Amino acid sequence: MLLFAGGKNAMKLFSAEGHADRLEPNLRSTAKTMMLIYIGFTASGTAAYGILGMNWFDALNHAMAALSTGGFSTRSDSLASFNSLTIEMVTIVLMLLGTTNFAILALLLKGRFRTILKFGELRLFSFILVLSIPILTASGLYVIYQNMADSLRAAVFQSVSALSTTGFSTVDISTLRADMNLLLILLVIIGGGAGSTAGGIKYSRVYVLFKALIADIRMRFLPERIVSESYTYKPQGKIYLTTKYVADISRF
């Protein structure tokens, strides 16, 4: 719709979708760039699935569903139907791409890796995965699987699927313990990155609110002269966590 909208209305629509970062100087160019990135990743995912043995109908559907973090499958038992480690790996990559801010993806394609490493929201995303995967691995080993490799494989896939709010599965969710399902639900609630196709609260919002909370605590208990203004890095540069910015993050 941004390709046909213009002026203030286009900017309002763009902001309402959660895309705070422009990839190009104007919104129409930004929309075209986002569309090209999306089409490119979808085509690459479809080709990868096809090479790994999926028929082209399944390949296209799963590539679109993984990248859009929609999680729709042509099979009743989702990705478990294929029982393929390589297909699961491709799906994980597509889900990770889908849950990442489009502006960050643009920086990634430009090779600006040092800039990307500054983004605290990505560090939080990695921390959540590093924390949840061992928990699910241990629980899966205790309940379902007989060896560590299979349990780890399932834990990695389910963690990424839940945190990206995709919903693909390689296990029967009804066989999981209540604590495992609770962890997966929490991951879904946290959700993916702002400006991505993922749902949930968004881990980028969680990161900003956490930093704002820490800053508020420091201001209350430490001398004002030693408390520096809190900030976060976004694709457009350093953003200071002002009261207005935190309020906007909290509302949308």
Where are the regions that the model predicts?
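Membrane-proximal intracellular helices of multi-pass ion channels
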Residues: 1-252
